């Protein structure tokens, strides 16, 4: 699939770091920055401006410990905790590992604990207050493949016919941890997890502070509020299929040392199994920043 991996558009503003646009859909490479250094207010604002322009930004050649990644993340807001658990029963730590390594053997596997990552989603939409930013720091990557795909929900919304935009306006979908587990074929949610994360509803069309609108979709959705269950799920499946079509997708090819940030408010993403999963480790350290209630 020849996804968007080149750019023709230019960078729209001046930044205090080197920026190279990676595609016209989303994505920019930032170089010449050491994220272990203190982050000034000016630098933080510039990073947030870059996220608004590019939606996904990759700081190359970083070498952060988990503590350093946590410290960097805190510049952007409150770090989220997690509802997911390791096979041991313990909850994921604040800086947790996204990997294809088996928890018991430490060897690469085709069925990692985090296999829900291979479905289109936006992080923590099963919360009243979902994720704003997610950060992944690439520790080990396959020699080829193991990419992450990002679909631009602003572009997908703008491409809809006007009549469909009007029909979707005001519609809400119910998101839950229980739906996530069912839709991804994972172990069903425990009663404790259901109590901790009861279903929430969010608009299918999200309106942002700058006035732009985007679709708000993904695998965490169980059904459409006030609509026949099967008809609503069919509508959502069709909408997500069109929204993640090739013209709206940027593929990020990981390099060891990447610290990649993305805006969950305007993107859905998924990992790709486009590598020999039983032969090559894929290890990334993850943090996420709490966002705002979608409107």
Predicted regions and their residues:
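Fe(II)/2-oxoglutarate oxygenase catalytic core
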Residues: 2-261, 265-295
